[in-house]
């Protein structure tokens, strides 16, 4: 048997004692969750979005690094000028990876039922119908994963 035990959280943010050792367990911040998934800092931190919505968005999202590698490798098999549309886009993880490979304007549409996630998509990728330009240019540089 192991001489260590699993840490059990008694109450949120409350120290607990285990064999005379004090531990403090805390929740990750939305920024830390974005970084953990490989998103740019502040990706879900847009005006009108609560921390709760940000946690939900990151929890329902995907980790970007492996998808960036897959999309990069797919590119050599696709025709020049390839575009994508996204069903159930969430906060745009696939779309972000796509435009980093294929360029701005190549993720041409998305569909999302969650209103907070839809706001994130419009904020970054824009929405012609609503006159929102988006700021995706800030995120086209590839991070080093």
Where are these regions (language model features)?
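Core alpha/beta nucleotide-donor-binding catalytic domains of modification enzymes
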Residues: 73, 78-145
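Class I SAM-dependent DNA methyltransferase catalytic core
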Residues: 1-83, 100-101, 113-116
